[in-house]
């Protein structure tokens, strides 16, 4: 019983650390791509870039959909609510 409990605990810790690492990587990659985007215009190119980036991240690492979708929704919501001009 104790062996099973310790194994399940270790498995949970590993899964949590992996999800945190992937979320930090996805956030940094989104921020780096956003910092490159500068100028005035519509938000559709930004949305396309974010969509392609998320597609690549999902294919490359297999991140849980719920975590990625929540992060992307926050980033896209911030881009859409912000001004159209400037560096994102």
Swiss-Prot record:
Swiss-Prot/TrEMBL GO biological process terms: sorocarp development
InterPro entries found in the cross-reference section: HssA/B-related (IPR008455)
Similarity annotation: Belongs to the hssA/B family.
PANTHER family xref list: HSSA/B-LIKE PROTEIN 17-RELATED, HSSA_B-LIKE PROTEIN 17-RELATED
The protein's name: HssA/B-like protein 13
Species whose genome carries this gene: Dictyostelium discoideum (Social amoeba)
Designated gene of the protein: hssl13
């Amino acid at each position: 019983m104790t062996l099973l409990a310790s194994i399940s605990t270790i498995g949970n810790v590993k899964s949590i650390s992996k999800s945190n690492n992937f979320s930090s990587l996805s956030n940094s990659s989104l921020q780096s791509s956003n910092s490159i985007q500068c100028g005035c215009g519509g938000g559709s190119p930004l949305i396309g870039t974010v969509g392609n980036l998320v597609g690549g991240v999902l294919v490359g690492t297999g991140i849980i959909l719920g975590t990625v979708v929540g992060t992307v929704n926050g980033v896209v919501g911030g881009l859409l609510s912000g001004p159209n001009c400037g560096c994102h």
